Amino acid sequence: MGAYKYLQELYKKKQSDAVRFLLRVRCWEYRNLPVCHRASHPTRVDKARRLGYKATQGFVVYRIRVRRGGRKRQVPGGRTGGKPKTHGVNELKPSRNLRSVAEERVGRRCPNLRVLNSYWVNQDSTYKYYEVILVDNSHNAIRNDPRYNWICKPVHKHRELRGLTSAGIKARGLRRKGTHRASKTRPSRQANYKRRNTVVFHRYR
């Protein structure tokens, strides 16, 4: 096995003494850094390379922390509006995963870069920490590389905001193959559930 294979197997045993100590020390370090900052190199090189990272010009890695837990609804001044049944504020769950949220925030922070992928690096009781791989689409090293110049096309602008990254595709429920298995996710899961569970009585004429 190569070195990256050993690293991959090491991260499968996160409860081992060595990995627990390593994650605890790194978590203390990440807590004292800004919320979103550029990393000098990937923390998990094996994972980053599997997701498309190369140690060449044009590739950037950003580390970001996202607060764990449910999502509070934005209600200015406490004015929820509507019926009391829909006045929920605290117990709402986000429809996307936190990795997709992390990609979105980094993408807004670096509008001149394209988000390629992301991966988990750490977590504690309050935050989850992710590293996001970004590509400089205006760099000649990327534009001249046939393996990566597809991301330079205008259609891939802010792909993280439109659910086109790996985390976004998973949040949309499109991780399945075949025509019938993902059919219930369009136009949305909520619309499909409503259509299949609403009893309609047509008026007798």
Curated annotation (Swiss-Prot):
GO MF term set: RNA binding; structural constituent of ribosome
Xref: Pfam families: Ribosomal_L15e
Listed GO biological process terms: cytoplasmic translation; translation
Keyword Ribosomal protein on entry: yes
Keywords: Ribonucleoprotein, Ribosomal protein
Top-level taxon of origin: Eukaryota
GO cellular component assignments: cytosolic large ribosomal subunit; extracellular matrix
SMART domains reported for this sequence: Ribosomal_L15e (SM01384)
Region (Disordered): 70-90, 172-197
Family assignment from sequence similarity: Belongs to the eukaryotic ribosomal protein eL15 family.
PANTHER family: LARGE RIBOSOMAL SUBUNIT PROTEIN EL15, RIBOSOMAL PROTEIN L15
Name of protein: Large ribosomal subunit protein eL15
Source organism per UniProt: Dictyostelium discoideum
